[in-house]
Regions:
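A residue-level signal for conserved active-site and pocket-lining positions in enzyme catalytic cores
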Residues: 24, 59, 111, 126, ...
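Domain-level signal for Mg2+-assisted phosphodiester chemistry and nucleotide/NA-binding surfaces
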Residues: 2-110, 116, 141, 146-148
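Active-site histidine-anchored catalytic micro-motif
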Residues: 117-154, 165
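Short glycine-/acidic-enriched loop or helix-start segments at secondary-structure transitions
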Residues: 32, 136-137, 159, 179
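Positively charged, polyanion-binding regions of nucleic-acid-associated proteins
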Residues: 190-207
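Long, low-complexity, charged/polar intrinsically disordered regions in eukaryotic proteins
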Residues: 149-192
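Amphipathic alpha-helical transducer elements in NTP-driven molecular machines
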Residues: 38, 68, 105-108, 134, ...
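Short, ordered loop/turn segments at secondary-structure junctions
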Residues: 26, 87-88, 129, 152-153, ...
Length: 207
């Protein structure tokens, strides 16, 4: 069966169910910025609404970061709730200071909690290319949920794309761009396993 027909079939199946959209804002924004592109929140919401009635739409980031200063206003205008996740600076043994946040953990916890508390939601859409979310995907699917991921073609974890029921390329299926004109700069984002995320995932599932 052609991919377009398979996608239409999944959308038709999900259309009678409610939909939740969870956006890893920094992952999506950084990925697109590599090609000097911005996140089109309206297109993202419209894509989610093709799967049914969108009842939850959250975007996760450190909104106090200057880089995200104007983003919450655009998200609110599109009917998407900005969820604040603070960033902390960690000094490694080598003396290198790195910025870290807990978006993966917070988003995963909210998503799994939503699965338990809102059985009316049959479709979960994750806007991220981070392979660490495989744990979350593996939790939702046994509950009969349709799991869709949206990621940028040049920075998405192949492992994540392989685990979801349906994968959409943001730059091809959501907000198409001319990839010959907009070429990503630098290497793709890496997605390593996160022990803290796995631990949080296990705690939430036990609830």
């Amino acid at each position: 069966m052609p991919a377009s027909q398979a996608r239409s079939g999944l959308q038709a199946k999900a259309h009678s169910q409610d939909v939740a959209l969870f956006i890893d804002w920094e992952n999506l924004k950084i990925s697109l910025s590599q090609a000097i592109l911005r996140v089109n929140v309206s297109s993202l919401r419209e894509t989610a609404e093709t799967y049914g009635r969108l009842v939850i739409a959250n975007a996760y980031a450190d909104w106090q970061d200057d880089w995200h200063q104007s983003d919450p206003e655009n998200l609110y205008a599109a009917g998407i709730e900005p969820v604040y996740v603070p960033t902390r600076v960690v000094t490694e043994s080598t003396g290198i200071r790195r910025r870290k946040n807990s978006v993966d953990i917070k988003l995963t916890a909210d998503c799994v909690e939503c699965c338990h508390n809102h059985p009316n939601i049959g479709t979960f859409i994750l806007a991220s290319g981070d392979g660490d979310f495989i744990h979350m995907v593996n939790t939702l699917r046994p509950y009969g949920k349709l799991v869709v991921a949206v990621g940028v073609s040049w920075s998405t974890s192949p492992r994540l794309a392989a685990r979801v029921d349906q994968f959409l390329y943001y730059d091809k299926d959501v907000d198409p761009v001319d990839t010959q004109r907009y070429r990503p700069r630098g290497a793709a984002l890496n997605s390593g396993e996160d022990d803290a995320l796995q631990h949080a995932f296990e705690l939430v599932v036990e609830i």
